[in-house]
Amino acid sequence: LSGAIDRNDDVLYICYDNEAYMNTGIQKSSLTPFGAKTTTTPAGKNSHGCLTQKKNVFEIIAAHGLPYAATASVGYMNDFLKKLERAKDIHGTRFIHVIAPCPTGWGAPESKMVDLARDVVDCGLWYLAEYEGEQESGVPGGTFTLNRKPREFTSVRDYLKSQGRFRALSDEEISLVERSRDAKWEMIERDWA
């Protein structure tokens, strides 16, 4: 992908992110969030799931200076479809990072997947945004745009506790997730305004 961006190949890359290697047995990936239980980061009496923070692929990709990048959620399909339409009209490498829950890996009923994809945005652990490179924005270094900011975040605790993969998290660990979210949003509001 980095090479395609460097060459500015005319391709739309969609990253389908279910926050682990779900199709091979639910192993941790660099996109697995802190505290999530996987088969390679179990949670129980002596272990607490994934101990690292989720890599921010959207910002890593944007740092390459490609023409267009975005984040999306299957819980906000209209936003996702608008971004697909936008990307379709741009020449060069485009990237859309889509959060899409997995019933088995997330430990929640299939009927709740769209709700979870909406909840992760509403509680602020996933944001909907776009990046336009210099070619599109005319601004050196490109521009970031936040597409949706909840007036007030819903409960991180409720979001995490609704999934089996986070059931072992302590109150202190949930507080850490909330503080990490708050720090990220402070950076977004400061740097993307």
Where are these regions (language model features)?
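Flexible, low-complexity linker and terminal segments
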Residues: 100-193
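Short acidic/glycine-rich loop or secondary-structure boundary segments that cap or lie
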Residues: 22-23, 78-80, 96, 103-107
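Conserved thiamine diphosphate
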Residues: 30-90
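Short acidic, glycine/serine/threonine-rich loops at helix termini
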Residues: 1, 23-28, 106-111
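Short, conserved beta-strand edge motifs with alternating hydrophobic and charged residues
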Residues: 15, 69-72, 95-99
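Short C-terminal domain-edge/linker segments immediately following a structured domain
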Residues: 16-20, 42-47, 125-131
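Thiamine diphosphate
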Residues: 1-23, 75, 79-82, 87
